[in-house]
Amino acid sequence: MEVDINGESRSTLTTLPFPGAEANSPGKAEAEKPRCSSTPCSPMRRTVSGYQILHMDSNYLVGFTTGEELLKLAQKCTGGEESKAEAMPSLRSKQLDAGLARSSRLYKTRSRYYQPYEIPAVNGRRRRRMPSSGDKCTKSLPYEPYKALHGPLPLCLLKGKRAHSKSLDYLNLDKMIKEPADTEVLQYQLQHLTLRGGRVFARNNT
């Protein structure tokens, strides 16, 4: 008899919370739906996505530090209470404007390192991005005027012989290769090019 009574009590205990949970779960889901689509979340997502698209249109690359700063701003704004968020919308917009201005300033100062057509490859050759139809003018720094005129230079100009180098002095080709690692790679390639044609050069040298 005790087992039956215990079994009945257990069955009632187990069956009672289930309908309660079923009744509570849709109420919770309905209560959570407006929270997910609440106003403080959506504009932050728009600004972050708009920031990335804005910078990818011009240079096709995004600085990760500025993205982290925007995410921190987003967490600060959404972490506060909704009443505070509704009370101070202008302050949040000022913070966002300041963050965007700061990120763009950082990007302008470091734009020399983010040039998409100067990516050193492993094998020594430089991969160069062809200018797309959307790129009407290439961004350039004032001390590098040849990039504004020509954009990414084709390989035929870079592989020109020494005899034609006088006519290409105005392009400042020596400024394009500033890193010592790149010059070492180019010297290595030149040595191997002469060794491939080796028999002729070996006869001349000996």
From Swiss-Prot:
Regulates the macrophage function, by enhancing the resolution of inflammation and wound repair functions mediated by M2 macrophages. The regulation of macrophage function is, due at least in part, to its ability to inhibit glycolysis. May also play a role in trafficking of proteins via its interaction with UNC119 and UNC119B cargo adapters: may help the release of UNC119 and UNC119B cargo or the recycling of UNC119 and UNC119B. May play a role in ciliary membrane localization via its interaction with UNC119B and protein transport into photoreceptor cells. It holds the Pfam family UNC119_bdg. The modification N-acetylmethionine is found at M1. PANTHER family: MACROPHAGE IMMUNOMETABOLISM REGULATOR, UNC119-BINDING PROTEIN C5ORF30. Disulfide bonds: none annotated. Its main location: cytoplasm. It comes from Pongo abelii. Belongs to the UNC119-binding protein family. The lineage of its organism: Eukaryota, Metazoa, Chordata, Craniata, Vertebrata. This is Macrophage immunometabolism regulator. Interacts with UNC119 and UNC119B; interaction preferentially takes place when UNC119 and UNC119B are unliganded with myristoylated proteins. The keyword Iron does not apply. GO terms for cellular component: ciliary transition zone; cytoplasm. Residues 1-41 are annotated as: Disordered. Keywords: Acetylation, Cell projection, Cilium, Cilium biogenesis/degradation, Cytoplasm, Inflammatory response, Phosphoprotein, Protein transport, Transport. GO terms for biological process: cilium assembly; inflammatory response; negative regulation of cytokine production involved in inflammatory response; negative regulation of fibroblast migration; negative regulation of inflammatory response; protein transport. Signal peptide: none annotated. The modification Phosphoserine is found at S25, S140, S167. It is found in: Cytoplasm; Cell projection, Cilium.
